[in-house]
């Protein structure tokens, strides 16, 4: 069955006439959503704690900023863009008591709705607009007249108007320039977590670092090992992004292709481990483990962060990256990223 995909012609921004959208959080996604919607003509207010370091930053961008409860109280749509582990507490304390009758709740990830940490009453529309890219790219693409694709879903539709609202939000974000794919909160949550854990982060990160270890332990220069197992990865990903895995393969030598086809690193046992990880995501085991750890002060999370904060390939990575002339040419983007990291590194109401 073909996926349902919507584009700009399929949404109408007049849905927002006379409505106000509250963006809770001003981190990676929060700043992009607030600025893009504002620049699309939507009435936006940013909800932050008065003591948040992001208050002045958001005001510098010309945005209206209010305490979370006040922002929620005057909004017709409330987009919650906080880290998963903080959403339920903020919802209970600041959102639920102040939510206008019939106001819509929106999310960029289905975690808290899917696993039941947030349970809105049935009279509130609930939808999701989840960009398939980090916030600074969502903003940069919008400013360039392009967009980052999104997946969209509706969980509760009490008035029959939630889909038009959801698509209008995606259009205001700039996402319908690229396209919005219909999904569900369940599908988005489970596939997103799986992709992170088994391929994009839990797969590639470990594979690259282990490859670096194998080569350097065998006596090869760390600089050469870095190039072979990490630096070239971006080029292959760019090719795959343009034309799929086949284009990436066809762009490499016959020798490289043969080595790809005959490799024994990824096996049926790997698939079984991935299926086990998916099961833990589906039955809620992973979510419970993560949320329980966070509730206890995140001791395991902090220990793991420290344990993995010094990947072996980064013993030479910074020096090599500083040598690349194109990195100097991209200094503007680097400065933007550093500014983001320094000012709004965490998407939470501080």
UniProtKB/Swiss-Prot annotation:
Q: Which residues bind substrate?
A: 253
Chain positions recorded as Mg(2+) 1 binding sites: 192, 196
Q: Identify the GO cellular component terms for this protein.
A: cytosol
Q: Where is this region: Disordered?
A: 331-350
Q: Does the keyword S-adenosyl-L-methionine apply?
A: no
Pathway connected to this protein: Amino-acid biosynthesis; L-isoleucine biosynthesis; L-isoleucine from 2-oxobutanoate: step 2/4; Amino-acid biosynthesis; L-valine biosynthesis; L-valine from pyruvate: step 2/4
Extent of the signal sequence: none
Which free-text remark accompanies the cofactor? Answer: Binds 2 magnesium ions per subunit.
Going by the UniProt record, its keywords in alphabetical order are: Amino-acid biosynthesis, Branched-chain amino acid biosynthesis, Magnesium, Metal-binding, NADP, Oxidoreductase
InterPro entries documented for this protein: 6-PGluconate_DH-like_C_sf, KARI, KARI_C, KARI_N, KARI_prok, NAD(P)-bd_dom_sf
Q: Which PROSITE patterns match?
A: KARI_C, KARI_N
Enumerate the cofactors the protein uses: Mg(2+)
Q: Which residues form the KARI C-terminal knotted domain?
A: 184-327
- Write down the Gene3D superfamilies for this protein, in alphabetical order: 6.10.240.10, NAD(P)-binding Rossmann-like Domain
- Residue limits of the KARI N-terminal Rossmann domain? 3-183
Q: What class of enzyme is it?
A: oxidoreductase
Q: What does this protein do?
A: Involved in the biosynthesis of branched-chain amino acids (BCAA). Catalyzes an alkyl-migration followed by a ketol-acid reduction of (S)-2-acetolactate (S2AL) to yield (R)-2,3-dihydroxy-isovalerate. In the isomerase reaction, S2AL is rearranged via a Mg-dependent methyl migration to produce 3-hydroxy-3-methyl-2-ketobutyrate (HMKB). In the reductase reaction, this 2-ketoacid undergoes a metal-dependent reduction by NADPH to yield (R)-2,3-dihydroxy-isovalerate.
Protein family per UniProt: Belongs to the ketol-acid reductoisomerase family.
Entry-linked PANTHER family: KETOL-ACID REDUCTOISOMERASE, MITOCHONDRIAL
Name-wise, this protein is Ketol-acid reductoisomerase (NADP(+)) 2
**From what organism does this protein derive?**
Bifidobacterium longum (strain NCC 2705)
